[in-house]
Amino acid sequence: MGKVRIGFYALTSCYGCQLQLAMMDELLQLIPNAEIVCWFMIDRDSIEDEKVDIAFIEGSVSTEEEVELVKKIRENAKIVVAVGACAVQGGVQSWSEKPLEELWKKVYGDAKVKFQPKKAEPVSKYIKVDYNIYGCPPEKKDFLYALGTFLIGSWPEDIDYPVCLECRLNGHPCILLEKGEPCLGPVTRAGCNARCPGFGVACIGCRGAIGYDVAWFDSLAKVFKEKGMTKEEIIERMKMFNGHDERVEKMVEKIFSGGEQ
C-alpha cells in the first residue's frame, strides 16, 4: 500500500489555522505513512491541481476564483476536510450585514485588485465537505485525531455537546449565571476544554453552533434579554462566528416578538 497523499489548501483567512498545523512536531511522524503533495504556505512550488487522498481546506470562500479552486479540490480529493472557523462557518469576515460594495470600499478604497470579490461563505456552500475541524484556530488534538483516524482507514466521530459540559467537568464557575456575562457556551460546540471560561472569559462561539439542531439560540437569547441586552446586541453576539446560521435571527426574533414569554 502506497503513502496517503495529503494536500493543505488556503482560501481567505489569516493563515492562523495553517500556522497551527505547521508548528506541530507530530507531523514529522507522518513521513513513513503519508506524503504532503501540496502546501503552498510551506512550499511555494506546490501544485494545487493534484490528486490527493485527503484535502484540508482552510479559509472562507470569498472570491470567484476560490469557488473554482474548491470545486477543483473536491474533484481531486477522496476526502475533504474543512479546517477552522472560516472554512466551517465562514469566519468573522462573513459576520457583517453591510453591503459587499461598502465593505469592499472600506478595505480596498479605489485600489484595483485582480480577483472578483463575493461575500465570505463556508466551504460547504459550494462543495460536499466530509468532515469538519472546528475552532479559531483548531485544537491540535482535533487535527491529530482526525488525521490519525483517516490514516488507519477509519472515520473520526463528531462532537455533539456544548462547551458547558467541559466547563462543568473542569469545575469552572458559570460565566453566564455567576458573573452575568453573555457567554455562548450553551450553544457552542465543545472540544476546546472550555479554555476561555477557564480564564474567566465568556465564550464567543469560535467553534460554531452545536450540530443536530440542538443549539437553542432562543433559550439563550431569553436569558440575555433578561440581563438587559437588546435584540441587536444579542444577534451581533451570536452571529460573530455563526454568520450563516439562519436559526440565529429567527430564534432571537421569536423572543422579542412575543413568541415566547
UniProtKB/Swiss-Prot annotation:
- Supply one GO CC term from the record: cytoplasm
Family affiliation: Belongs to the [NiFe]/[NiFeSe] hydrogenase small subunit family.
List ligand-binding residues for [4Fe-4S] cluster 1.
C14, C17, C86, C136
Cite the EC number: 1.12.1.3
Q: Which cofactor does it need?
A: Ni(2+); [4Fe-4S] cluster; [3Fe-4S] cluster
Q: Where in the cell is it found?
A: Cytoplasm
**Self-association or partners: how does it assemble?**
Heterotetramer of alpha, beta, gamma and delta subunits. The nickel-containing alpha and delta subunits constitute the hydrogenase activity. The beta and gamma subunits (flavin-containing dimer) constitute the sulfur reductase activity.
Residues holding [3Fe-4S] cluster: C192, C196, C203, C206
One Gene Ontology molecular-function label: 4 iron, 4 sulfur cluster binding
Thermal dependence of function as given in the entry: Optimum temperature is greater than 95 degrees Celsius for hydrogenase activity. Stable up to 100 degrees Celsius. Loses 50% of activity at 80 degrees Celsius after 21 hour incubation.
Q: Which Gene3D superfamilies match?
A: NADH:ubiquinone oxidoreductase-like, 20kDa subunit
The molecule here is called Sulfhydrogenase 1 subunit delta
Q: Which domain of life is it from?
A: Archaea
Catalysed reaction equations from the record: H2 + NADP(+) = NADPH + H(+)
Q: Which Pfam families match?
A: Oxidored_q6 (PF01058)
Q: What does this protein do?
A: Part of a bifunctional enzyme complex that functions as an NADPH-dependent hydrogen-evolving hydrogenase with sulfur reducing activity. May play a role in hydrogen cycling during fermentative growth. Activity not exhibited with NAD. The alpha and delta subunits form the hydrogenase component that catalyzes the reduction of protons to evolve hydrogen.
- Activity across pH: Optimum pH is 8 for hydrogenase activity at >95 degrees Celsius.
